[in-house]
Structures are given as structure tokens and as C-alpha cells.
Amino acid sequence: MSAPLSLFVTGTDTEIGKTFVSAALLHGFARAGLRAAAMKPVAAGAYERDGAWRNEDADQLDAAANVALPAAIRTPFLLKAPAAPHIVAAREGVALDIGTIVDAHRRACEMADVIVVEGVGGFRVPLADTRDTADLAVALGLPVVLVVGVRLGCISHALLTAEAIAARGLPLAGWVANRIDPAMPFADDNVDTLRAWLEREHRAPLLGALAHMSPPSPDAASHALDVNLLLNALRAAAPR
């Protein structure tokens, strides 16, 4: 049996569709015959149902995965307030320990063929005084998929994020253009520009361009993603 594959999903900002794209990837992996699981290691914003605290993003990932991870592995750190994780964690008396997440990821890898790890916010969101989500991605040692929210300013945001990923020594396995502003002029031209620059500077392929969907359907969106291209990139980046 081949070793499990895993990837870290980050974005150009918060609220640009990381969970939507992560769920679409899960549908695509499942359609490819893989046991697909998801982690949302740090989630900020919880609601209570049936005596348990839950998170909407984690719920969406659970709905798309065909392997259900225990909540403590899927989301080791569930914070109640929907705000910057390090601020909420300090107020709730929680230490966002990267080692705990790495251990949860190791256990998740024993349960599935591919694990989608969704970050929180953008690529460099503080988790503590001196550590951020980029440090988490490095500790996990995973290839990164960048979700670009296609709106005004996305070109600079995407190129800066790609530079930050490369500076940490992580491979950019690919990127997804997610149309979040349906009224944006020249959206296709922006995507074409990013396709050329990210390919030239980082050899990062466009995995798919997602049209604005209302309501969003990760299953439908999965058909616009080149899952096989991503799987090949993940296999190439896997430790030998």
C-alpha cells in the first residue's frame, strides 16, 4: 500500500473560499477512488449543538470527506469566538501548540489515503507570540495549494503569498482561482496573468478556475478541478 498523501490549503486572505475549495478537492479525491479525510486544525468560531461545540467550516469538510476523523483529530483546537486565533486563544486560555497538530496529522494519515489540511485565514496568521500558520505548514512538511480569491488586488496578494510559501521551502503544488466577486471586471485577464506568473516563478499549475456559485456546491465545483494533476504533484513531492 502506498504512503498517504497530504496537502496544506492556504489562501490569499480570509473569506476567499478555502473551505469551499478544500471540500471540492475532497469530492474529487473520493471520485478518484481514494479515502479522503480533512483536518481544520485551528478553527475560530463555534456554535453549540446537542451539547457539543462545532464549527461551520469543519462541518462542511466532514460533509465532503468520505472518511470521518474523530473531532479531536480533525480539529485539535476549536475556539469559540470568530476572530484572530492567537487573540481568541489567549482570551480563552488555550495554547495553540503546533506539536499537538502534527501528532493529530500523523494519526489522520493512518486512517486515509489523502488528507486535506485547511489552514486558517491567510498563509501567515499568528498562532502565538512568535509562531504562525506558515510555521505550522513547515512543521507538517506539506505541499501547499493556494486558493486565490479573484477580486481586485488578487494578483499582488497571490504573488506575495507564493513568495512567502517559497521562502519557507515549501512546494507550491498548484493554485485555484475562486471567483468571489461576480462583478469584477477583467476577471479572466487577472487569472491569465496569475497563471503565467505563478507558472514561471514557481512552476505552480492552475488546478482550476471556479465560477461564482450561489449557493456554493463543492461537489459541482470539484468537476472543474484537475485532481489528477494535483495528485501527481503530491506524489512527486512525497518523501522518498
From Swiss-Prot:
It comes from the Bacteria. The keyword Magnesium applies. Keywords: ATP-binding, Biotin biosynthesis, Cytoplasm, Ligase, Magnesium, Metal-binding, Nucleotide-binding. The keyword Transmembrane does not apply. It is an enzyme of class 6 (ligase). InterPro entries: DTB_synth_BioD (IPR004472), P-loop_NTPase (IPR027417). One of its GO terms (molecular function) is dethiobiotin synthase activity. Its main location: cytoplasm. It is found in: Cytoplasm. Its EC number is 6.3.3.3. GO terms for biological process: biotin biosynthetic process. Gene3D superfamilies: P-loop containing nucleotide triphosphate hydrolases (3.40.50.300). Pfam families: AAA_26. The active site is at residue 40. Its cofactor is Mg(2+). It catalyses: (7R,8S)-7,8-diammoniononanoate + CO2 + ATP = (4R,5S)-dethiobiotin + ADP + phosphate + 3 H(+). Pathway: Cofactor biosynthesis; biotin biosynthesis; biotin from 7,8-diaminononanoate: step 1/2. GO terms for cellular component: cytosol. ATP binds at residues 15-20, 57, 118-121, 178-179. Belongs to the dethiobiotin synthetase family. Homodimer. HAMAP family: BioD (MF_00336). Catalyzes a mechanistically unusual reaction, the ATP-dependent insertion of CO2 between the N7 and N8 nitrogen atoms of 7,8-diaminopelargonic acid (DAPA, also called 7,8-diammoniononanoate) to form a ureido ring. This is ATP-dependent dethiobiotin synthetase BioD.
